[in-house]
Regions:
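Conserved active-site neighborhood of the chymotrypsin/trypsin-like protease fold
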Residues: 73-75, 85-167
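C-terminal recognition in membrane/secretory proteostasis and scaffolding
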Residues: 1-34, 119-120, 133, 152, ...
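Residue-level recognition of beta-strand microenvironments
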Residues: 67, 84-86, 97, 121-123, ...
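C-terminal cap/linker of serine protease catalytic domains
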Residues: 19, 23-24, 37, 51-56, ...
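Active-site loop architecture of trypsin-fold serine endopeptidases
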Residues: 31, 73-76, 103-105, 140, ...
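N-terminal activation segment of mature serine protease catalytic domains
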Residues: 25-86, 93, 103-105, 109, ...
Length: 231
């Protein structure tokens, strides 16, 4: 995914999948920021302990935002995102490409109800990832990034998002990692398979509006992004 002519985002990704009434989560592998505008691989070990889920939620909560996309003055999409890094006076938000695609105005709403306008830094269709930027002075918190390779089957995971619109902003759902290394065929046109993604399986409930929100481990670290819902 190209960030623009100022830098490149290197983003190995997989998707996690739960087929049924739950959802699909796009998961970053070994990511962290190097402070130079890139996301790079990081192999630090994450020790997961069953501490209070409330503590983990509190750690990530204010970094999660509502993303409202509009075109010609009409709202066309609502999703979720999270602040993942800052540099100088700019803060960067990760969300899904399909949340902001075809929009000409993007409104960001923080957990305290304040809002600001975001600009698109880069986006990529296949991974369904978009990077937005806002003024650093507007944000409330920055998420801590974990390592999805360290998550084990049965580990507790949770999501924070905006299911069914901003009325339910900040909704938390909890589940476990149900499986690893699933392969899912993805079609952009609906007729043919365009590519195959390696996925993790989770039973954490994901609904429309959660797209772009974080999948989080028990330490309050982001290990993935909710990408789309399969039923």
């Amino acid at each position: 995914m190209q960030k623009n002519n100022k830098g490149t985002i290197i983003l190995p990704v997989i998707i996690s999948l739960f087929i049924g009434a739950l959802g699909t989560t796009l998961v970053f592998l070994n990511f962290s920021s190097n402070g130079n505008g890139s996301i790079i691989q990081n192999v630090n070990k994450v020790t997961i302990t069953e501490n209070s889920i409330a503590d983990a939620v509190n750690k990530i909560y204010d970094a999660v935002v509502v993303v409202e996309a509009s075109k010609e003055g009409k709202q066309i999409s609502t999703g979720t995102g999270f602040v993942y890094k800052t540099k100088d006076n700019v803060a960067y938000i990760l969300t899904n490409n399909h949340v902001i695609d075809n929009s000409d105005d993007i409104n960001i709403i923080y957990s305290d109800g304040s809002n600001t306008t975001a600009q698109i830094v880069g986006k990529e269709t296949y991974s369904d990832i978009a990077v937005l930027q806002v003024a650093k002075s507007t944000i409330l918190s920055v998420a801590e990034l974990g390592n999805s390779k360290d998550v084990k089957i049965g580990d507790t995971l949770f999501t924070v998002g905006t299911p069914l619109g901003k009325k339910y902003q900040g909704t938390v759902t909890k589940g476990i990692l149900s499986g690893k290394d699933r392969l899912v065929e993805v079609s952009l046109s609906g007729n043919v398979t365009d590519y195959i993604m390696r996925v993790l399986q989770t039973d954490a409930a994901i609904n429309p509006g959660n797209s772009g929100g974080p999948l989080v481990n028990i330490n309050g670290e982001v290990i993935g992004i909710n990408s789309l819902k399969l039923v």
